[in-house]
Regions:
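Structural preference for solvent-exposed beta-strand-turn elements
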Residues: 1-163
Length: 163
């Protein structure tokens, strides 16, 4: 048994982060690796990453990291497990082919996907934008009526340009 990663984290924080990013994963299963979440532990930061190749999301959480490393497992299954746990602290560790979720009363195992197949999300350096969320929400409400809900072919606006 060779442990690749081992951490302890607050269930509440982990569940909240998973809830936010799990919606971006590929639920249709067209590309199976995109239904996974990349779990990375480094320097007391636990990072969760998902993508559907159009949009990617990363969430960073404080955690007690016993061994730095990574895990890669199905985000929906992981979220369902975490959501139903009663313990306030969770231990997560990964081995060659499995990701383990452990509490004092239970232990779950999820199949681990191949890290090399998961797409890398590259963020531009020094590209941080900070704003109050209500300002973005108000702006989106104004332009939403102009965005088509269906791709009708030809020239149809199905997105919003941010500048």
């Amino acid at each position: 048994m060779r442990i690749k990663m081992k951490i302890k984290i607050s269930k509440k924080d982990f569940e909240k982060a998973l809830a936010k990013i799990q919606g971006l994963s590929d639920k249709k299963g067209n590309i199976p690796i995109l239904s996974n979440v990349l779990l990375e532990a480094k320097e007391n930061i636990f990072k969760l990453t998902t993508t559907n190749l159009e949009v990617g999301a990363t969430s960073k959480l404080p955690a007690y990291i016993e061994k730095e490393g990574y895990g890669l497992c199905n985000v929906i299954k992981l979220f369902q497990i975490i959501k139903n746990l009663s313990s306030s602290e969770i231990e997560i560790f990964s081995e060659e082919n499995l990701v383990f979720i452990k509490t004092p009363n239970s232990e779950f195992k999820l199949a681990q996907a191949n890290r090399d197949e998961f797409p890398t999300i590259e963020y531009p350096e020094n590209f941080d934008i900070e704003f109050e969320s209500h300002l973005l929400l108000n702006a989106l409400k104004k332009v939403k009526p102009a965005v088509s809900k269906e791709d009708l072919g030809g020239f149809t606006l199905v997105g919003i340009y941010f500048n």
